[in-house]
Amino acid sequence: MSFSRSAADPADTLPDLAATLAAPDTHAFLRLGDAFHTRLPAAPLAAPYVVGFSDEVARLLGLPASLAAQPGFAELFAGNPTRDWPAEALPYASVYSGHQFGVWAGQLGDGRALTIGELPGTDGRRYELQLKGSGRTPYSRMGDGRAVLRSSIREFLCSEAMHHLGIPTTRALTVIGSDQPVVREEIETAAVVTRVSESFVRFGHFEHFFSNNRPDLLRALADHVIDRFYPACRDADDPYLALLEAATRRTAELVAQWQAVGFCHGVMNTDNMSILGVTIDYGPFGFVDAFDANHICNHSDTGGRYAYRMQPRIAHWNCYCLAQALLPLIGLQHGIADDDARAERAVDDAQAVLATFPERFGPALERAMRAKLGLALERDGDAALANQLLETMHASRADFTLTFRRLAQLSKHDASRDAPVRDLFIDREAFDAWANLYRARLSEETRDDAARAAAMNRVNPKYVLRNHLAELAIRRAKEKDFSEVERLAQVLRRPFDEQPEHESYAALPPDWAGSLEVSCSS
């Protein structure tokens, strides 16, 4: 799909974009064939209006920041014009399967999302645009295919917040709202969020064709992913084993980044795991406030399968599911005639790759924690020092984000400067004991306090998308006041900067925030 960007007349951008999206679409995923997707128009969304818009993502797609103000923008990104598109240009929903909460769920698929096309980015990559909440598809099962305003605002804000934290993620171009009612635990209103990613292929796509005993389609999918996103794997002795290794590495490194900022995904089902190793499917997520290693952000996760401390283990388990799906392809290059012998070797090779997950995750997390503690030099006891801090935080339920941010104020020589971070701990003596160990470790560093603090503030955010901040923006948006969505999005674009005019966004959560619950109900 091509798109002509004319700087001469930005007013023509939206009509050109609409025409481009309505043209026959031949981008790479669609060339895999009808077994991978179903084409259909979006369900009409009544009287749509713009709730939020990312001019950064627009620029990434070569679109002007003025796009959202152009007539027809809300209609286009609600999916309404797709009813008039020709059959060969209709959006599509893809089919996949997966494990949900550790149990095989069988066929799933895009039950409320439609990909409307692909655009070239200004960074040389190509990006798919997907409307989440665009209505029922053949894969909706019992759902109505809609997303609600609250969950759409949360996904919009968190997608962009994670990007600015430096964590691989899908992006979000816009949120479109409507007064159209949808029934959840109560009556809510419908919304559509436009997600942007190089690909929305998930572990579950591979599981689907494996479970249906279609090695031909499984291979076509793997070849698509390798050729498009992992070209170096094509030159490996076994490209499909190399794909497993690359996806395992990226997944391990991604979850290490989650842990380092206190991010809980909430629903790490295999159908919510990106083959590109990016954060995808923002549902009942949350950033940990008062630190609890057993924190469960998803009210529906009664067993704590996806608790904060469990995320690395679950990610590893999900990679096992991906490996199982790829087994029919692994070893094909070796020319082993005996199927049983080839399968046995494939299992051995896959297990060897999976065994590298801890080797990828552990050092990645250690590097992140060393940076968060302002340690430029590497010492054997650094991981233990970081773990002891987390244990002390856990015991006192010290705020995760503020603890690491305020550690930058601690002096390697003067304990009297500990108060800002010390006051976050109920057990002050336990903190003092740890701080003495930390100061001893800092004495081995060559940087002075100011240089160390500056380095720490570049990796320890002051601003994250706390649940109560999102809730306040949602409450205003329900009253048709979208200023808080915009303001919060702007604050989260600069998570590491001091923003004196927005100091309240970095404060401890109010007492009422403890009663907020997020679940899979959206």
Curated annotation (Swiss-Prot):
Residues reported to bind Mg(2+): 272, 281
Family stated for the protein in its record: Belongs to the SELO family.
Disulfide links within the chain: none
GO molecular function: AMPylase activity; ATP binding; magnesium ion binding
EC number: 2.7.7.-, 2.7.7.108
Organism domain of life: Bacteria
Binding of ATP, residues: 109, 111-112, 132, 144-145, 195, 202, 281
Keywords from the UniProt entry: ATP-binding, Magnesium, Manganese, Metal-binding, Nucleotide-binding, Nucleotidyltransferase, Transferase
Function statement: Nucleotidyltransferase involved in the post-translational modification of proteins. It can catalyze the addition of adenosine monophosphate (AMP) or uridine monophosphate (UMP) to a protein, resulting in modifications known as AMPylation and UMPylation.
Record: active site: 271
Catalytic activity line of the entry: L-seryl-[protein] + ATP = 3-O-(5'-adenylyl)-L-seryl-[protein] + diphosphate; L-threonyl-[protein] + ATP = 3-O-(5'-adenylyl)-L-threonyl-[protein] + diphosphate; L-tyrosyl-[protein] + ATP = O-(5'-adenylyl)-L-tyrosyl-[protein] + diphosphate; L-histidyl-[protein] + UTP = N(tele)-(5'-uridylyl)-L-histidyl-[protein] + diphosphate
Cofactor(s) the record lists: Mg(2+); Mn(2+)
Pfam family name, one: SelO
InterPro entries: SelO (IPR003846)
UniProt name for this protein: Protein nucleotidyltransferase YdiU
